[in-house]
Amino acid sequence: MAKATGRYNLVPPKKDMEKGVIFSDLCNFLITQTLQGWKVYWAGIEFDVSQKGMALLTRLKTNDFAPAWAMTRNLFPHLFQNPNSVIQSPIWALRVILAAGLQDQLLDHSLVEPLTGALGLISDWLLTTTSTHFNLRTRSVKDQLSLRMLSLIRSNILQFINKLDALHVVNYNGLLSSIEIGTSTHTIIITRTNMGFLVEVQEPDKSAMNSKRPGPVKFSLLHESAFKPFTRVPQSGMQSLIMEFNSLLAI
């Protein structure tokens, strides 16, 4: 008797990659207040964003700090001693990091349209606004973005987070501690510190670094706990202790 089989069926896509990743996930930045800070949902990823370290950032900026923190303040004079620098929220820092992750994919030059155009627009939205929803009006772009493309974006963002986690805390050994991404309108610098990631957005010419006439810069801190669920190798208590001793940074 003839028997129905699925012998030549196409292999189904990996569910773990494409689970819940739809286009609207990229265009919605959902924020929920919690006791410790916020929960943020974007691109099928949930982040727990803490306010840890923000009080210290403010004290360094307002010159209300302990003498032991002087090195931190002097290491980043364009942030803490610049009248044109402005402290932002940790939510802003997360948006900038995600925008940088999208820009990192664009710099790879291996993506094709319409993915490149969509990523550029979404990156600009995250970087330059505080709105929770982005309306991509080009219907054809939405129609051409497959689940595979969307899951690729999510996967690459998680890879970028691991790239940040692999950075060394600022120290005397000259090890790589920052990632810098330049666009035609901004320069993004993300630096690893004891607490997490010091995020800054400057003008393209990095005029904030000009000691005589420092230009504008926005900055904030994203505590490392926001990325811990997504990093490959969790740090042991001893590793964290060694990291702290390797750096005299207050943050």
Swiss-Prot record:
Under the heading InterPro entries, the entry gives: Filo_VP24 (IPR009433)
Kindly indicate where the leader peptide sits in this chain: none
A Pfam short name: Filo_VP24
Query: Which subcellular locations apply to this protein?
Result: Virion membrane; Host cell membrane; Host endomembrane system
What are the UniProt keywords, alphabetically? Answer: Host cell membrane, Host membrane, Host-virus interaction, Inhibition of host innate immune response by virus, Interferon antiviral system evasion, Membrane, Viral immunoevasion, Virion
GO MF assignments:
structural molecule activity
Q: How does it sit in the membrane?
A: Peripheral membrane protein
Zinc as UniProt keyword: no
Q: Which domain of life is it from?
A: Viruses
GO biological process assignments: symbiont-mediated suppression of host innate immune response; viral process
Q: What is its main location?
A: virion
Q: Would you tell me the Gene Ontology cellular component terms? A: host cell endomembrane system; host cell plasma membrane; membrane; virion membrane
Q: Which family does it belong to?
A: Belongs to the filoviridae membrane-associated protein VP24 family.
Quote the function comment for this protein. Answer: Prevents the establishment of cellular antiviral state by blocking the interferon-alpha/beta (IFN-alpha/beta) and IFN-gamma signaling pathways. Blocks the IFN-induced nuclear accumulation of host phosphorylated STAT1, by interacting with the STAT1-binding region of host importin alpha-1/KPNA1 protein, thereby inhibiting the latter. Without the activity of this protein, activated STAT1 would not enter the nucleus and be unable to activate IFN-induced genes. Plays a role in assembly of viral nucleocapsid and virion budding.
Please describe the quaternary structure of this protein: Interacts with host importins KPNA1, KPNA5 and KPNA6. Interacts with host STAT1.
Quote the protein name from its UniProt record.
Membrane-associated protein VP24
Natural source organism: Reston ebolavirus (strain Philippines-96) (REBOV)
